[in-house]
UniProtKB/Swiss-Prot annotation:
It holds the Pfam family Amidohydro_1. Zn(2+) 1 binds at H13, H15, K98, D246. It catalyses: (S)-dihydroorotate + H2O = N-carbamoyl-L-aspartate + H(+). This is Dihydroorotase. Zn(2+) 2 binds at K98, H135, H173. Pathway: Pyrimidine metabolism; UMP biosynthesis via de novo pathway; (S)-dihydroorotate from bicarbonate: step 3/3. Signal peptide: none annotated. InterPro entries: Amidohydro-rel, DHOdimr, Dihydroorotase_CS, Metal_Hydrolase. One of its GO terms (cellular component) is cytosol. It comes from the Bacteria. Keywords: Hydrolase, Metal-binding, Pyrimidine biosynthesis, Zinc. It is an enzyme of class 3 (hydrolase). The gene is pyrC.
Length: 342
């Protein structure tokens, strides 16, 4: 039987939601992750230090794992102050601020309409050593949804990188060859997270033979040439790329609807799904760096010191999983997952 023991991984991009669903989402993500960076796009968004610490307390109240710790982020708005950034940084629990272009994804209406409006805040973040996380898509209606990431790189991200060379930036959940190349060619302060579903699937999986709403996420799945570029980046051993699931649950009826929500749920099997990708590429030896080393190294945090063991043993993912008083349909629902965490 094939086994693989790696340093305990972290998830550098996770949605836990809030309220009664935390019992389920914290359980799923806390099974084997050491840390998870929690996204702030609640309703209302997590824009203050007090809100972030209160949210952390609600998460910890449901946390049954001694080895799992949530790291928090602030939702960056055009009303965010430098004082708030300094206060957040001083807590030791809030490690980043997230830039959402207004309207780019779930609960992003409070986001930034013009990045120049937050330049004073980015200057403070650069001075304080707080990381900037970016949802890298433009939101103007004249730009095709499949081109929004590429346009963002050229018109928004490149100027930020140029104007704030000491600011550490994570381009979240990249979906294109263009984004992978941008990160590779940028300086040492630019990195990216990559999701399991963008490595495993492309837009054909979502659209051919009927619309598959549980593959619908933002940024949207792209063509297979972009998928393969992401696989190459993730499995290459390049320290600029690391694990961020963007596991984003919505209740079953909110996905299977005339106007369904964006987000795919992978927290039930995240490291197992990544292992499939690395095995398929013959790069299992690089999984540990991607999942367990590159993220904490970029964040200047210590690596986890304990381990988990994966076994090459297929199991069937559940058709649905508990999500508070409702249900979520996970990726690979009713289908085989090739690896199992023992």
């Amino acid at each position: 039987m094939t086994t693989l023991t790696i340093t305990r991984p972290d998830d550098w991009h996770l949605h836990l939601r809030d309220g009664d669903v935390l019992t389920d989402t914290v359980r799923d993500s806390g099974r084997y992750n050491g840390r998870a960076l929690i996204m702030p796009n609640l309703v209302p968004p997590v824009t203050t230090t007090e809100q972030a610490l209160s949210y952390r307390e609600r998460i910890q109240a449901e946390n049954k794992s001694d080895s799992f710790a949530p790291l928090m982020s602030l939702y960056l708005t055009e009303k965010t102050t430098s004082e708030e950034i300094r206060k957040a940084k001083a807590t030791g629990h809030i490690v980043a601020a997230k830039l959402y272009p207004a309207g780019a994804t779930t609960n992003s209406d409070s986001g930034v309409s013009d990045v120049k409006n937050v330049y004073p805040i980015l200057k403070t973040m650069q001075e304080e050593g707080m990381l900037l996380l970016i949802h890298g898509e433009v939101t103007t209606h004249d730009i095709d949804i499949f081109d929004r990431e590429k346009t963002f790189l050229d018109t928004v991200l490149a100027p930020i990188v140029n104007d704030f060379p000491e600011l550490k930036i994570v381009l979240e959940h990249i979906t294109t060859k263009d984004a992978a190349d941008f990160v590779k060619n940028a300086g040492p302060n630019v990195a990216a997270t990559i999701t399991a579903h963008h490595l495993l699937f492309n837009r054909n999986h979502m659209l051919v033979g009927g619309i598959k709403p549980h593959f619908y996420c933002l940024p949207i799945l792209k063509r297979n040439t972009h998928q393969q570029a992401l696989v190459e980046a993730a499995t290459s051993g390049n320290p600029k790329f690391f694990l961020g699931t963007d596991s984003a649950p919505h209740a079953k009826d909110k996905k299977e609807a005339a106007c369904g929500c964006a987000g795919s749920y992978t927290a039930h099997a995240s490291i197992e799904l990544y292992a499939e990708v690395f095995e398929n590429e013959g790069k299992l030896e690089n999984l540990e760096a991607f999942a367990s080393f590159n993220g904490p190294d970029f964040y200047n945090l210590p690596r986890n010191t304990d381990t988990i063991t994966l076994v090459k043993e297929a199991w069937i993912a559940p058709e649905t999983m508990a999500f508070g008083n409702d249900f979520v349909v996970p990726i690979r629902a009713g289908e085989a997952v090739e690896w199992l965490v023992k």
